[in-house]
Amino acid sequence: MEVKPLANIKSAIKRAELNVKQNEKNSAQKSAMRTAIKAFEANPSEELFRAASSAIDKAETKGLIHKNKASRDKARLASKLA
């Protein structure tokens, strides 16, 4: 995806390009997390729970979601497993 920045300063143009790349990467990571959660909710199993929990932890580690949200999501998934 090409960036057509409004900025005139070279460093600001570079930052705009970086923001686009980081946004794509973060969106993909968050989407993978949501997909893992939906897969577990569709068919609750121990294996899918571990995959969803791992995806949530990765998103938390990368700063995509808050640690409290990660904990809450994992607790809700665990209650569906039990």
UniProtKB/Swiss-Prot annotation:
GO biological process, one term: translation
UniProt xrefs under SUPFAM superfamilies: Ribosomal protein S20
Any Pfam family the entry gives: Ribosomal_S20p
GO CC terms of this entry: cytosol; small ribosomal subunit
GO molecular function: small ribosomal subunit rRNA binding; structural constituent of ribosome
Protein family (similarity comment): Belongs to the bacterial ribosomal protein bS20 family.
Protein name (Swiss-Prot/TrEMBL): Small ribosomal subunit protein bS20
Gene name of the record: rpsT
